[in-house]
UniProtKB/Swiss-Prot annotation:
GO molecular function per UniProt: N-acetylglucosaminylphosphatidylinositol deacetylase activity
Protein name per UniProt: N-acetylglucosaminyl-phosphatidylinositol de-N-acetylase
Annotated gene: Pigl
Subcellular location: Endoplasmic reticulum membrane
Primary role: Catalyzes the second step of glycosylphosphatidylinositol (GPI) biosynthesis, which is the de-N-acetylation of N-acetylglucosaminyl-phosphatidylinositol.
EC number assigned by the record: 3.5.1.89
Database matches in Gene3D superfamilies: LmbE-like
Species assigned in the record: Mus musculus
Family: Belongs to the PIGL family.
Domain observations: Retained in the ER by two retention signals, one located in cytoplasmic domain, and a second signal in transmembrane domain that is functional in the presence of membrane proximal residues of the cytoplasmic tail.
A GO CC annotation given for this chain: endoplasmic reticulum membrane
Length: 252
C-alpha cells in the first residue's frame, strides 16, 4: 500500500512538473513554430452539436485565442434529439461567450438534413458543400474539427471529418486554408488526465494545446452553461476528461 501511495504521489508530482514546463513552453511558441496561421488569421471550429465546443474543443478555442486568432464556430445541428433544440442553441451561445466568441461569430445550422441522431448518416456531399460555403463566407484560414473516430465515435462527428477530408483531398478548399483534426484516444487516456499528459507530450502530434489552471476553470464554466446536458456522468467527464484540458491535433 505504501508503494502504491508513493507511486501515485510521484505521478502527481511529475505531471505537475510537466504542466509547469508546458505552460511556459506553450506561451513562448509562436503560431508559425506550431505550423499554424499567424496572428489575425481566421479559424473556424466545426462541431456537430451544442456542447461539443466545451466538451472537446475548449483547449483549441482558448489556445487559438491566446495566439490572437479570430475564432468562429459552426454547429451543424441544434442538438434536438430530445426536443431541446431551442434551449440548447441558447446554451451554446452562452458557452461560446465564456470562451470569448461573440454571437456574431457563432453559426448554427438547424436543418432536417442534419438531425442530432447517432443512427442517421449525414450526406457527405451536402455537409461538404454547406461547410465550404461557410469557409468562403468567413475568409477562413484554418478549419478545426473531429478526426476519423470522432472522439466519442458519434456518427455525426465522423460525418464532419468525412466532409472536410473530401474537401481537402478534392482540392476544393481555398488556397492557404489548413485543416486540423482533433485526435481521438482510447478510453483509459481519455479519462485519466494526469496519466495521459506525459504520454501526450511524448506522442506525435502537429499541434498541442494544454490549458492553464485559469483556462481550465474557464472551460468548466463554459460546460456549465449546458445545464440541460449536465447529467451525473457529465460532472465526472468535466473532472477527469483530457479534452477539458488537452487537445492534440493533426493536420490533414
Amino acid at each position: 500500500m505504501e508503494l502504491v501511495g508513493f507511486l501515485c504521489v510521484a505521478v502527481a508530482v511529475l505531471t505537475w512538473g510537466f504542466l509547469r514546463v508546458w505552460n511556459s513552453a506553450e506561451r513562448m511558441r509562436s503560431p508559425e513554430q506550431a505550423g499554424l496561421p499567424g496572428a489575425g488569421s481566421r479559424a473556424l471550429v466545426v462541431i456537430a452539436h451544442p456542447d461539443d465546443e466545451a466538451m472537446f474543443f475548449a483547449p483549441t478555442m482558448l489556445g487559438l485565442a491566446r495566439l490572437e486568432q479570430q475564432v468562429s464556430l459552426l454547429c451543424f445541428s441544434s442538438g434536438n434529439y430530445y426536443n431541446q433544440g431551442e434551449i440548447r442553441k441558447k446554451e451554446l451561445l452562452q458557452s461560446c461567450a465564456v470562451l470569448g466568441i461573440p454571437p456574431s461569430r457563432v453559426m448554427i445550422i438547424d436543418k432536417r438534413d442534419f438531425p442530432d441522431d447517432p443512427e442517421v448518416q449525414w450526406d457527405t456531399e451536402l455537409v461538404a458543400s454547406t461547410l465550404l460555403q461557410h469557409i468562403h463566407a468567413n475568409g477562413t484560414d484554418l478549419v478545426v474539427t473531429f478526426d476519423a473516430e470522432g472522439v466519442s465515435g458519434h456518427s455525426n462527428h465522423i460525418a464532419l471529418y468525412k466532409a472536410v477530408r473530401a474537401l481537402h483531398s478534392g482540392g476544393k478548399l481555398p488556397k492557404g486554408c489548413s485543416v486540423l483534426t482533433l485526435q481521438s484516444v482510447n478510453a483509459l487516456r481519455k479519462y485519466a488526465f494526469l496519466l495521459d499528459l506525459p504520454w501526450t507530450l511524448l506522442s506525435p502530434q502537429d499541434v498541442l494545446f494544454v490549458l492553464t489552471s485559469k483556462e481550465v476553470a474557464q472551460a468548466k464554466k463554459a460546460m456549465s452553461c449546458h445545464r440541460s446536458q449536465l447529467l451525473w456522468f457529465r460532472y465526472l467527464y468535466v473532472l477527469f476528461s483530457r479534452y477539458m484540458r488537452i487537445n492534440s491535433l493533426r493536420f490533414l
